[in-house]
Amino acid sequence: MEDTIKIVGEGLTRLIEKIVKDNNTPVKDAVLDRFINYYSAHLADFTRPYPGVIKTLEMLGRYKKAVISNKRESLSKKLLDQLGLMKFFDIVLGGDSASGKKPSPAPVKKVLETLGIEPHRAVIVGDSDLDIQAGKG
């Protein structure tokens, strides 16, 4: 289970690369395109915010908040919108929007710079080791 969570957290492209053992790039690209089309159409079918998330976001209203996901930015925004959460965030950064994906600290640094926040004044909340590793960078 932990291996599955780690693979999924690395993003769609890495997931497809690990599943499709064929080194043929067109095959991988076709599988990725088909998966993205399906995934995009069913983003929120089985996804719900963790209990207490909405109340917590409401309580943190005056603070700047961001989402950093290894998911493509367009899909991240679409999912947040479908879940009614987009309104809580000042910025959403996807795995295709920074020079590196989590666990790289690059997306965290980009968000802090964009929002004008010094690293020692920021808090990271995540649901995987990748989030913690990115925050420590």
Question: Where do the PLM segments sit?
Answer:
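Substrate-recognition element of Asp-dependent hydrolases with the DxDx(T/V) motif
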Residues: 56-81
